[in-house]
Amino acid sequence: MSNLISAVSWVRRGVAEQHPSKYVLDDKELERVSTLARIELEDAKLELERAHEAAKGMGKGAEGDEGDDVVDDDGDDAWVDDEDLEGKESEDKNDAMDVDGEPSAQSKNDPDDLSAYKLDEYDDDIQSSNLGPFSNIKGLTYYKDNEEDPYITLKDDPEDEREELEIYPTDNLLVVAKTEDEISQLEIYVYDESQDNLYTHHDLMLPNFPLCLEWLDFPPAPISTPSHAQPKANELRQMGNYIAVGTLDPEIEIWSLDVVDPMYPDSILGRPDKTAAHIPVPLGTGKKKKKKTKHRAASSAYHVGAVLSLSWNKTHRNMLASASADRTVKLWDLSRDPTISGEGGGAIRSFDDVHKDTVQSVQWNDKEPTVLLTGSYDRTVRTFDSRAPGAGVGAVVGSDVEALRWDPWEAHGFYVSLENGLVLNFDARTLPSNLNEPSPARFTLSAHDGAASALDVNPHIRGCIVTGGADKMVKVWNVTDAEDDGGKRSVSLVTSRDLGVGKVFSTVFSPDDPLTLAAGGSKAKLQLWDVGANFGARKAFGAKLKAAGKALRERNEAENRGGVIGVVSDGEESDGGDNDD
């Protein structure tokens, strides 16, 4: 797996806690983690025993005519454990010993006999390995505070640490989904626009490769545990600072960005105990033994494939939509206990028939908050009211969908970027309900050589969009409406740049600065670009900025770098990428 940044998300100013809290691992948190992870030890043991029995049966079946063909692909026996066989042999030998475990007279006279040490029973005393992944976490933190630990002689200054972690109301946060050296994590950056300063604040470890991010301010409901009941509605926080993460796993993790160094997310949407592939199940005829797993059965309550896209509803703040490789779109109510039991829980709605292939992207319509827009590898886009999905409309786009966005300036307009490098603009009111009918786009951009993998629409300037592609270019476009140009719509390229991030996988406009965007890609490098440093951009968008009541700040040092700001390591200079076109 190569190093890359797969997704970037902004956090607007004034949202983050000025002084983030430290993660505390106490008994209450351990209980919450165990419940949230749905650790079912007895079920896991039973599944392992069944897997061993099935594997042994497969081995016996192959000892006949084709016994020589029993080969494991990895070069070793993945199913019949040598230790189990040795254990059986040792049991047979132990039958010759006395029932009370005392060695025989012959063994007493044998100087090489080690039966007195009961080495055959040594493994029986080790039980902790079967108690699950969280069984020994508590023992890792013997002292509640490093000040109490006598082995830590260099004490931290709480005031210095508090100052280092402080986030000012004028700071933006950026959350970056990054994989480097086979390790996946979220990196949280602080961006001070007034000083053009970008630095890493903290990071969060992830269990699998991250695919998408979505910021939200709705605190997910805490889970109820045996010793702690679900709190009342008036006892819950009303606002927060959270990031939802979709990965190659079928679950959705929600993390608080106001907690430093957490070990476990605030909430998990899905069923890790049902969808996890940690328990191997042998498949096949018995002639060969391979490490395979059963196909995950589809469910209306949770995803069984990778989560590729997330969208938070800004009007109905407790609603989160997700799109998955399992070909479904699901809706989640964050105000409900995330624990899924036999009586219910999980996703409140699952749209299983909207697409016939992997659903790559999903987004709520901010103007009509019950309407969803989806795009798929079946080369179609669909838009429908979540209350009546059967009455939706759509279009065939001719290539796999990479990204899509509603136009925040037009309730029914949206953009779609495709694998063939095109970007299409549609008016949902003109689309047919039958996909066999023609559905022409309002206009088409030949945006990139290769996939147009990133797309965003500026929330501050009407008609300003940005695209990023496999050709390593980030391009800013100006769309002039018909009423603004004498009855004729026009689309023009304002500026383009290779920001040095490799193939571009994500590019997003700032929620606060009108012409600042962030980009990440195949080089695992985050870059910010203040497009306002470009003369052509200032000229193209100057009138629109003035009409929107926005203004570009006076440029200084950053203008010498073309407005590009990156994370500067010790002894390095900021890489401004290539020059503008």
Which residues does each predicted region cover?
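Blade-loop segments of beta-propeller domains
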Residues: 200-243, 248-249, 266-297, 305
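Per-blade loop-tip surfaces of WD-repeat and WD-like beta-propellers in eukaryotic adaptors/scaffolds
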Residues: 191-196, 254-299, 304, 314-451, ...
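Short glycine/acidic-enriched loop and turn motifs that connect beta-strands
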Residues: 181, 250-251, 260
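Acidic/hydrophobic-patterned starts of short beta strands in beta-sheet-rich repeat architectures
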Residues: 173-174, 227-230, 234-244, 319-321, ...
